[in-house]
Every structure is written in C-alpha cells, then in structure tokens.
Amino acid sequence: MDTFRVAGVLAAAALTARLGEAQTPAPQPTPGINPTQEIARETPEGPAIVAGPTEIRIGGYVGVTGVFRSTADGGGIGSNFATIPFSDTADGNLSEFRLSAQASRLSIRVNAAPAPDRATLAGYFEMDFNGTVPGNVGVTSNSAGFRLRNAFGEAQYRGRFIVAAGQAYTLMTPPKGQLSIWPSDYDLTYAVDVNYVAGMVWGRVPQVRFTYRPSTSFNWALSVENPEQQIGSGVVTLPSCCASDLTGQYNTGSNGLDVANFMPDIVSRVAFNQGKLLHIDAGGVLRVFRQTVKPYDQPVKQTGGGLSVNARVTPGTTTVLGQFAYGPGLGRYIGGLVPDVSISADGQIHPIRTTSWVVGVEHRLTTQASAAIYDSGVHADRNYSVDTSGSDIGFGYPGAPTSANKSIHQVTGVFAWQAWSIEGRGSLQWNTQVSWLRRTPWSAGTGPPSADAVMVLSQIRYNLP
C-alpha cells in the first residue's frame, strides 16, 4: 500500500511539473536599453501570465523626472514650445525647477493565439499620470490625474492583413520600419520631454486602420482618424462680424469635445525597408474644415492637409534619421504648434502652410548606453487679410500678437544609461535631455525679436519586467 502511495505522489508531482512548464513561457534573453519613452512593440516581450490560449503582460515603468528651464513656461514635464516667455516679461526672467512622477506608466497587453483559420488577436491599454490636475496639486498631495494614452485592439490575418481600432498614434507619426500601430515601432526620438521635440509630427487619436504587408520590404496602410480643427488660443484674429460664432467652431484649447467637425481625417502611408539598414516612408493626410456664420444657411468648407517623408539609415550601431512634413492646414499634426487656418471677413477659410523637420543622429554606445542629438523645428507662413473695419485679421499680420509664431527651432541632446538589468526582475535606467529652444514671432512689436530657453530634463525609472 505504501509503495502505491509513493508512486501516486511521484506521478502527481511529475504531472504538476509538466503543467507548470506548459503554463510558463520560455525565458527570453535580457534586452538592452530602451532609450525611448515608449514601452511596447508589435513583438511581445517579457514574462507573461498564461490563461488558456492567451498571454497577459503588465508593463510600464515607475520613475521621477527632474525639470529645469531657464524661463518659466509652466509646462510641467511637457514643454510649451509655442509659448516660451520673452525676456521683457516676469516669466522670461524666472527659471523653474520641479520634480514629478507623472511620467510613470502602466500598460496591460493581451495576446491571443490564433484558432485554425482565424486571426491572431492582440489588445493594448497604456496610461500615465499626465491628466487633469487640480489647481493646488503641488501643495500637499500631488494627486496627478490618470490619463489614457493608447487603447486599441488588433487582428492579423496570415501576417499580411491587419485591422486595428482604438486610440493610438496617428498614421502620420514617423515609423521606424514596418507600418505598425504599436507605440515602440514609431520613431519618436530619445526625448525625455513628454511633448517630444518641436517639429515632430505626432498625435494619439481614435482611429480605424487597415494595413497590408505583402512583404517586410513593402507596406501600405490607410487610416480613418478622429478630426479636430484648431486655431490655438489668441493666435488667429477672427473677423469682427462673427468672432463669437467662429470661436466655438474651432478648438482654441478650451473647447473639450464641443467642436462640430465635418468628417474624419483620411491618412495613407507606404513604407519601404531594406532590412535594418534602410527605411523610407511617405504619406499624407486629407482634412476638410467647415464653419458657418449668420444667417447659418451656407456652410463653408475647405480642404487641407499635408504630406510627410521620413527616412532612417542604420549602418551598424548608428542611425541617421530625417523627418520632413509640409502642408496647408497641417498644424494640428505638428503638436498643435501652428493653427490650422485663418478666416477672412467674407467667411472663407484659408489653411495656413506649415513646414516641419526633425533630423538627428542616434548612437548605441553599448548594450547599456545610448546617445543622440537632434535639430528640429517648425515654420508657419503668414496668412492674413483685411477686415471690414480696415484692420488686419488672420495669422502673422504686421502688429499680430506675439503668440503668432513664424518659427520654432530646437536643438536637443540625450544620453540614456541602463544601470542594471536582471532577467525577470526589470531594469533601472537614467535618461537626461538638454535642449536649446528659440521661438520667433511674425511681429515682435517693441519687444525682443525672439524668445530663448534652455531646458534640462532628467529621469530615473524602474522598468517593470
């Protein structure tokens, strides 16, 4: 009897061990440093909780970011590139310093193995703490608001056809290689600033996307994205006949979701890859702006949008990159740094032509350290007319407010170092960004011709396994 009991116990132990092995994914090699803010690429990484045919991964990082600026723009860990204060103001003569944990990030990812002749499914949620904050947030509790960044689902059919829906980076955002909706597959620089660098084309918007990948060398994608026509706050002078009507029809920074947009933005992009050595992509966005004024019986529509071309060359451990965009009415997609349109006294819509760029060199020093330098910026053409009263209106006219920027230019250097990494336990890293920034308005009046700032952002973070 004892012999049978011992045999039964051994058999049960063996079965339990087998089941445990089946429930635990094979260990993966410890990855090198990820010098960017983004934490999830299309290929799953890290340990997973296995539940039947699905794998669940909880990711993100916990960190603190120190910020120093030579002028006080009050932007927290996201810089207000378009409103750097001038030297003849109080804020232009005050530096600022703060520590913040708002960049800490939490993600939940689910990957489901495909059933026979069915799609491979994946879902992703990503949040941080850069949401709405109460006016006294920094006094005692520092209770920063939880914020949605990404939330999307994806279905891949035989590795060639992909359908994705949810909130994610716009298809106008520069990719690193193959067209993908996953955040780490975009070329968002090494910047610590949560607004990245001035001149970058990006946005996280609700969308439905279709991608066709006949090979790794060629991809094509089409995206239907949530629109939002915007003119900034106090940047565009509206015609006196209908300023109050028009203010409610364009996002001026305080409209929430009240703007009555006409139709979704349509974005398309193609990408060409030669292994990891060379990547080139090109695409564009079609937008339609709409408004109405008294007697409200003739809505006015105007098309706009823009084109962008991006390239990366990676010979070994160094990457040289260039991102260029141009178009009338493209301002929303360049971090909202330029208004989309101006409006003349006859009620016609005039898209503002905008040019932006990011060029840089990124170098992986070791598997634990990387460095990069970037030159970036945006230029907006002036677009104004004469009101019925005889005064100038629109954007960039002589005597326009100093918030109407002709150009914003930024030079940025970043160093990232992974102090330690332990398989299955995560890693500790330190990223530091130093930037010089200049904004030049179309009309400075009697004040200084431009506003300059130096910024240092340094972050220590623990990356969850």
Predicted regions, residues:
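Detector for outer-membrane/organellar transmembrane beta-barrel domains
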Residues: 261, 273-413, 417
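Outer-membrane beta-barrel translocator domains and adjoining extracellular loop/strand segments
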Residues: 71-76, 135-144, 176-183, 232-256, ...
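Membrane-spanning beta-strands of outer-membrane beta-barrel proteins
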Residues: 101, 146, 203, 263-265, ...
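Surface-exposed loop/turn segments flanking beta-strands in extracellular/periplasmic regions
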Residues: 78-88, 186-192, 243-245, 342-347
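Outer membrane beta-barrel
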Residues: 43-78, 88-236, 262-275, 312-326, ...
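Membrane-embedded beta-strand positions of outer-membrane beta-barrel proteins
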Residues: 58-60, 123-125, 163-165, 220-222, ...
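Outer-membrane beta-barrel "beta-signal"
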Residues: 415, 450-465
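Cleavable N-terminal export/targeting peptides
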Residues: 1-36
